[in-house]
A protein has these predicted regions:
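Short glycine-rich substrate-engagement loop in P-loop NTPases that contacts/grips substrate
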Residues: 108-117, 148-189, 199-206
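Walker A/P-loop nucleotide-binding motif
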Residues: 124-144
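Active-site donor-binding loop signature of nucleotide-sugar glycosyltransferases
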Residues: 61, 105, 163, 257-259
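Walker B catalytic acidic pair
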Residues: 194-195
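A short, basic N-terminal segment
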Residues: 1-104, 267-285
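Residue-level preference for the first positions of well-ordered beta-strands
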Residues: 127-131, 157-158, 189, 221
Length: 285
């Protein structure tokens, strides 16, 4: 046992010297590259107790190498965490690449979406959500996914799904209905895409209300995208829809999306590009 302790003390008090290292005027070992100490003296009391007067210390280049290594490891861990959040958080894999960095900047509501991310702590604390409403193809889903991606980059867990997926999951789930909904509501932010497009059956509406109501009671923010108009949301056609819409509009600040249909514009751009390529090929023959 005594030999083991002595070996341990020797190990923690011995510095390995490189060929270019040298002993300074203070008797300590110095790095031959950065010329800073690779040793430091113990206090007098500690030196007497250990029987050694010095211990290894990081020179400047060792410290720089360690910090660089730790930064790389931290970055890799962050990338793996974000990748896992995106894999779990997006039910549609294509949305993983929908980010502010890839945005074309043409949507006037981009600033509103960025503001949500920048103010996340406040939005979370005050339970403030968004209701993106407007015509088809105006960028609602894209900017909602941008918010999700940006928060995931901050290592915030977000779930972006839709009621078609939720209803299918509930029908096929081996876990109980309550457990599934509780898991959905455990996310700091829940995003429901294409709200209002789900089946209008009695069962379907009951499940929609259950999810919305559970989220409301959780006190956590919700973002929803919908093609419904604000008029339709504020004046629903029947009581089941009224219950759902009332909960939704009480949780989310309405944000209107207007303008051209980006999907149609993209399709037109592709068509024009195709015509250009065909013309170039014809001219080259």
């Amino acid at each position: 046992m005594k030999n083991e302790i002595e070996a341990m003390i020797t190990d923690i008090t011995t510095t390995t010297a490189e060929a270019e290292d040298y002993t300074g005027e203070d008797g300590l070992l110095y790095c031959g590259k950065c010329h800073t100490p690779k040793e430091a003296y113990f206090s007098k009391e500690t030196a007497q107790w250990l029987g050694h007067d010095r211990h290894p210390a990081e020179c400047d280049c060792q410290r720089a190498a360690r910090e660089k290594r730790e930064a790389a490891e931290s970055r890799q861990k962050h990338l793996e965490t974000v990748e896992d959040l995106k894999r779990r958080g997006f039910t549609d894999p294509a949305m993983r690449n929908w980010t502010f960095e890839h945005d074309n900047g043409r949507n006037p509501q981009t600033e509103t979406a960025r503001f949500y991310v920048e103010s996340w702590e406040t939005m979370q604390a005050e339970n403030i959500g968004y209701l993106f409403w407007g015509g088809v193809g105006t960028g609602k889903s894209y900017l909602a996914a941008c918010i999700a991606s940006a928060l995931m980059e901050k290592e915030v867990a977000v779930c972006m799904t839709n009621f078609a997926t939720i209803l299918n999951d509930l029908a096929a789930s081996f876990e109980g209905r309550n457990e599934y909904i509780s898991r959905l509501c455990s996310y700091p932010l829940l995003i429901l895409d294409d709200f209002g497009m789900e089946r209008g059956t009695e069962y379907g509406l009951e499940q929609v209300y259950s999810v919305i109501d559970s989220r409301y009671r959780s006190g956590k923010p919700l973002i929803a995208t919908t093609n419904l108009t604000l008029e339709e949301l504020q004046h629903p056609q029947d009581t089941p829809h009224a219950r759902i819409y009332d909960r939704l509009t009480s949780m989310c600040a309405p944000v209107r999306f207007t303008g051209s249909n980006f999907r149609k514009a993209t399709a037109q751009e592709k068509l024009e590009r195709l015509k250009q390529l065909m013309k170039q090929r014809k001219e080259s023959l």
